[in-house]
């Protein structure tokens, strides 16, 4: 017996029928499932008469969604639409964007190369600002050159009573009269004067022959010290 010829099924698949229906019913807004089923039943009754028609129909829609040929703009219960293929203008825009990005990256690289100049400018600015530090040093030196209580007392003892000595009270008055700007706002003035006298006695620059409450006299070492001031 001759072998039977195998005939291929030329019926279009459900997905193709849905695409056909969408194109035929195209009004710019898509088509509902009901409208698509009606179109297939009206134009392909042999396919629509299959008992599992609804199952095949829904499965074809699902496959079309997965392959990005269909989409539901308003969700599965809304209308079904064909996905528009990417246009040539979109490709052109993409190329233009790539060119712009390339230009921007080139410009950014050029600006990166120029950054060392900024660093040099900053370094130069730092060098110019160095004299300010010198000014601070000068100010510090001026402050440190202010007369001390020791120096005021040595000067006072020499200036009063022909250098023969002076009482604490007389020395304090002398200091307030001669150096008002140095002591007028000092709260612990008495303490500073007494402490300076005590240190002068200990260092051998001053002496109190009659004891702490007596006259303050200047010694040879004190006279030599005051000359160097």
From Swiss-Prot:
Gene3D superfamilies: Winged helix-like DNA-binding domain superfamily/Winged helix DNA-binding domain. Residues 84-94 have a biased composition (Low complexity). It is found in: Nucleus; Chromosome. GO terms for biological process: chromosome condensation; negative regulation of DNA recombination; nucleosome assembly. Disulfide bonds: none annotated. Coiled coil: none annotated. Could act as an H1-type linker histone. This is Histone H1. It comes from Candida glabrata (strain ATCC 2001 / BCRC 20586 / JCM 3761 / NBRC 0622 / NRRL Y-65 / CBS 138). The lineage of its organism: Eukaryota, Fungi, Dikarya, Ascomycota, Saccharomycotina.
